[in-house]
Swiss-Prot record:
GO terms for molecular function: cobalt ion binding; phycocyanobilin:ferredoxin oxidoreductase activity. GO terms for biological process: phytochromobilin biosynthetic process. It is an enzyme of class 1 (oxidoreductase). Gene3D superfamilies: 3.40.1500.20. It catalyses: (2R,3Z)-phycocyanobilin + 4 oxidized [2Fe-2S]-[ferredoxin] = biliverdin IXalpha + 4 reduced [2Fe-2S]-[ferredoxin] + 4 H(+). Its EC number is 1.3.7.5. Catalyzes the four-electron reduction of biliverdin IX-alpha (2-electron reduction at both the A and D rings); the reaction proceeds via an isolatable 2-electron intermediate, 181,182-dihydrobiliverdin. Keywords: Oxidoreductase. This is Phycocyanobilin:ferredoxin oxidoreductase. Disulfide bonds: none annotated. The lineage of its organism: Bacteria, Bacillati, Cyanobacteriota, Cyanophyceae, Synechococcales.
């Protein structure tokens, strides 16, 4: 197994992901790994209880801009369900090169549930990064969910990447890799699917604590810390500022990518 060093181009952050068709056909097709994981996420998302759309300003649904002379296309799909306050799936494409899938499921702090996150970064040379995790916001991972994750077989990925400096927000189950083959890409989708199935089972069985319970307050604090840590990624902000403007970038990061949990 090779551990790959280098700048983290997008572990659970950099650009965004899209669930709508891109309006441009000038570039290459969406990478098969991005298509496969997006399809699997949508399939599992549909199994969540009381699923409904998340209110989204229409100007944030489908976005286009210019970055270094290339067209940047972004689209977003957001939902909510019982137990999860925000389910976000995006795909972005820059010209005929960079493609990014970004997905985060944020739990309602009243429920003892983790944050699901997955990112894929693809370029002309293939996949440079793929990451998936269930990050606990409680003091520990719920026991039933922990057992489910421990039972999942972890594929023997050849190139395991190092986490960024702010990687303390991730769990011991985080997988951050550079797939070395189409077989490893398939393994990654199946692994992410295993994480999603474990999460969905926990969501279905979960019951809420009171809003003023110590456990809820602690989870709210931890989720707020997660969002703050994610917002510290200057690369994400720099790309958005260059393609649009600083005010728009701030709004996108604060309202779409890593919106703080609402006050209890």
């Amino acid at each position: 197994m090779e551990r790959v060093r280098g700048a983290c181009q997008s572990p659970i952050l950099i650009l965004l992901a899209i669930v709508l068709p891109f309006p441009s056909t000038s570039g290459p097709a969406i990478h098969p790994l991005i298509e496969s994981l997006a399809a699997r996420i949508r399939q599992r998302r549909a199994q969540l209880p009381e699923l409904s759309p998340f209110a989204l300003d229409s100007v944030m649904e489908s976005i286009s801009g210019q970055l270094d002379g290339e067209e940047l296309l972004i689209s977003n799909e957001l939902h909510r369900c019982r137990g999860m306050r925000k389910l976000h799936l995006e795909i972005a494409r820059l010209g005929g090169g960079l493609q990014v899938l970004h997905c985060v499921f944020f739990p309602d702090p009243r429920f003892d549930l983790p944050i699901f996150g997955a990112d894929i970064v693809a370029g002309p040379a293939g996949i440079s990064a793929a990451i998936v995790d269930l990050s606990p916001v409680g003091l520990t991972m719920p026991e039933a969910l922990l057992h489910g994750l421990e039972s999942l077989p972890i594929p023997a990925f050849q190139q395991v990447r190092e986490l960024p400096e702010w990687g303390s927000i991730f769990s011991p189950f985080v997988q951050f890799i550079r797939p070395a083959s189409s077989q490893e890409e398939s393994w990654f989708v199946d692994l992410a699917d295993g994480y999603l199935k474990a999460l969905i089972s926990s969501v279905i069985d979960a019951t809420p604590d009171a809003s003023d319970a110590a456990s809820t307050i602690q989870r709210h604090k931890s989720q707020l810390s997660y969002c703050i840590q994610q917002k510290r990624n200057d690369k994400t902000r720099g790309v958005l500022e260059k393609a649009f403007n600083p005010q728009w970038a701030d709004r996108y990061i604060e309202e779409i990518l890593f919106e703080d949990p609402p006050p209890l």
